[in-house]
From Swiss-Prot:
Identification of the protein by name: Uncharacterized protein MJ0053
Record-linked SUPFAM superfamilies: P-loop containing nucleoside triphosphate hydrolases
Lineage: Archaea, Methanobacteriati, Methanobacteriota, Methanomada group, Methanococci
Gene3D superfamilies reported for this sequence: P-loop containing nucleotide triphosphate hydrolases (3.40.50.300)
InterPro entries: Arch_SelU_Cterm, P-loop_NTPase, SelU
Organism expressing this protein natively: Methanocaldococcus jannaschii (strain ATCC 43067 / DSM 2661 / JAL-1 / JCM 10045 / NBRC 100440) (Methanococcus jannaschii)
Amino acid sequence: MGLSFNGENMIIFGLFGKTGCGKTEILNELKKHHPVIDIEEIARTRGSILGDLYHLSMRSQEEFDYLINKEIEKAKKFGYAVVEYEGRKIGGEKKLKIPELLADIKNYTYKILIDCPYECQINRLVSIYKPKNEKEKEILINKFLILKESFKKPEMIEAVDNIIELIKQDKYYEAAKLIEEKLYREHYMRNVKKIKPDLIVYNEDVKKSAKIIDEFIKKKLKEHNLI
């Protein structure tokens, strides 16, 4: 098993799962032991529709292509890479196209599904998106106003209006619940239906989850005679 390109093989371990279940934190732990292609970090954006909020300044497509291909070349030397699956594009209002190698689910040799308790997910979403000051609050509201324009279904427009109202009232926990239910859940379910996980990790502790995945990766690398 493995991915064949340019006459070489590379095993790809993919992390899949809901926004807010700690995939990025787990990926950062795995960087200590494994070659990781961090698409979000390279793009300078998060993988969700709110990806380019606040301090994040997303790269141009040209910069992104150059840097991600450099990381792919580095990973080839190890024969494998760990990647958080982002889909075909990444970003918020503007999007960057992800190379086919990492965009196509079929190229992922092993699929690792990260799940977590609902409360953990919502609290993590709050910690990521809660504005630190009035300026950030204004940015967040404007982001949803722009987002609203991209929706045609009345129920989606109403959901965004409700989210904006909750943000104005500083009810970030309630806003996060609505964001997860109306904006993230369908996208997540669509991706999860496409995969048959080789490993499911219920993430309540990032270090413990990373250790489980680390052991799984090492086991598979042994099977492929890579360690």
